[in-house]
Amino acid sequence: MEEAFSFAGMAEVPFFTVLSSRPGPGTGVPTYTEQADLRFALGQGHGDFPRVVASPGTVPEAFRLAAEMLSLVWTYQAAGILLTEKHLSESRVTSELDASSVAWAEPVAHSGGEYKRYALTDDGVSPLLFPPSSESIKWSSYEHDEAGITTELAEDIAAMHDKRDRKGAALTEHLRSAQTVNHFGEDGPLILTYGSTTMSVLEALVAGDIRARVVQPVYLEPFPVWEFGDLSDEPAVVVEQSSTGQ
């Protein structure tokens, strides 16, 4: 998985995977749930390249988020991880899912002329071309020029690094208009949590008749820092199902 994820970062392959964590390390406790793979997901693959990581709290949210992330990885030709836990991925629940609420991705398509797989663009996203075509289509895991030809020239390497950085910035800007954080409650102490642990926290608050505000970041990379400006100086309880509080 590590190598494939990094390959996708360099080749700019739309790559989407589901990571469902459980207690580790090693075989661990495979029939129970845990959230110890957060750092593993955020740091997946060697090298610097844009990626998107998001974690749903409920089954309907998992459905919506999976469709949304598929659209993102195709639109931005990036690698993505839907991070969940054994608790959610193996739960049984009856939900009404609105298929009309999701849409097919519409990646930027090549419009004609000489095709450059890694064409330098303002937002870092190169147009895609699909077979059949008389044009040569190259996908390279080696650093490359615009045509996808292997290169070790410093100026080409810098240009492609800058291209990928621009793409990451465009992805982050896109998420500013998306639902990246969920808020529950209007007053009381602040609790931060993510993933399916959110529902456990809300259930515990109801059972204990406790008033609190619960903030659940849905997108973990790029992290929606713009949603946390008003909370940056406020004390909070972080409820996360890992021994180190990743």
Mark where each language-model region is.
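Thiamine diphosphate
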Residues: M1-F40, V52-V73
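A broad, low-specificity signal for short, low-complexity segments enriched in glycine/proline
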Residues: A11-T17, F40-G45, A147-E155, L202-E203
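Preference for short coil/turn "hinge" residues that link or interrupt alpha-helices
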Residues: T31-E34, G47, R213
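A glycine-rich, acidic short-motif signal
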Residues: Q44-V52
